[in-house]
Design a protein with these regions (language model features):
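Small-residue (primarily alanine) positions within well-ordered alpha-helices
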Residues: 12-13, 156
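Hydrophobic alpha-helical connector segments
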Residues: 54, 68-100, 152-159
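Long, low-complexity, intrinsically disordered segments
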Residues: 218-250
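Amphipathic alpha-helical packing segments from all-alpha helical-bundle domains
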Residues: 80, 116-142, 154-157, 184
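Amphipathic C-terminal alpha-helical segment
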Residues: 92, 139, 159-177, 189-199
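Amphipathic alpha-helical segments used for helix-helix packing
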Residues: 95-117
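Helix-turn-helix
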Residues: 8, 16-58
Length: 250
């Protein structure tokens, strides 16, 4: 029995998990589908749990590393590369993939509370993504492309979590359009939050449409997005002679 047989089992089972989840995975059906003997299957994986652990370690982990591969060891062009990854997520989305949802998110919700080994392995997959993005953000700060006040780890966690959330909301709505819209909003939001003023124009070619105000201010999103990281605008208010209030900034 060769290593290629083992890899084939893992890949086919990963695809089955993507489609219907881990709990519904039937090893007997996969054995029949692969046209291998039970002996060959159980030679590699003595039980379903061991199969699941191997799928996470050997298929899911590299799958998610590859998603963010363009950010690994990057030194310049971080914001543009990050926005491009999100653009790719929109491009490759299909009605079927959206209805299935994100396989990592699905498995976290399905298995992390019933099997702590699963939880730990799924956390590793999550953390690998966070570390790639975190390192890239730190490089962007050093290059002067990203704002210095950005907390790299918190922002990396936020990005991974936001994308997982986009998949989850779109899955429950069974709507590719919702996914594309949400990720587009995420792109605009990240540009506002992350990119230093001097580097803002360099990422405009991969972002969604924006409009510029008549006063010449920096581009504003056409969709009203609340920026959770922005400081509120300070206004100086004084009482008028009529007893009302007015703002000097009006």
């Amino acid at each position: 029995m060769s290593t290629s047989t083992r890899q084939l089992i893992l890949q086919r089972c990963f695809e089955a998990i993507q489609a219907k989840g881990f709990e519904t995975l039937r090893t007997d059906k996969e054995i029949a589908r692969l046209k291998i003997t039970k002996g060959a299957f159980y030679h590699y994986f003595p039980n379903k749990a061991e199969l699941g652990y191997a799928v996470v370690d050997e298929v899911m982990l590299p799958y998610y590393e590859q998603k963010w591969a363009s950010l690994a060891n990057i030194e310049i062009g971080v914001a543009k590369a990050l926005i491009a990854v999100l653009e790719q997520e929109k491009t490759k989305a299909t009605e079927t993939s959206i209805k299935r949802g994100d396989v990592l998110t699905n498995m976290i919700l399905e298995m992390s509370h019933v099997d702590d080994i699963f939880r730990q392995k799924l956390e590793v997959v999550n953390e690998v993504q966070v570390k790639i993005i975190q390192k890239a953000i730190m490089s962007g700060r050093i290059a002067g492309e990203l704002k210095n006040q950005t907390d790299a780890r918190s922002m990396a966690l936020y990005i991974v979590g936001q994308l997982m959330g986009c998949y989850t909301i779109s899955k429950v709505r069974a709507s590719k359009e919702t996914f594309v819209s949400m990720v587009g909003t995420m792109q605009k939001q990240l540009k506002d939050v992350l990119v230093a003023e001097t580097a803002a124009s360099k990422v405009s070619d991969v972002t969604v449409n924006t409009v510029t105000s008549p006063s010449g201010d920096r581009p504003k999103s056409t969709i009203g997005v609340v920026n959770p990281f922005a400081k509120p605008e300070e206004k100086t208010e004084e009482k008028s002679t009529r007893g009302g209030w007015f703002s000097r900034n009006r």
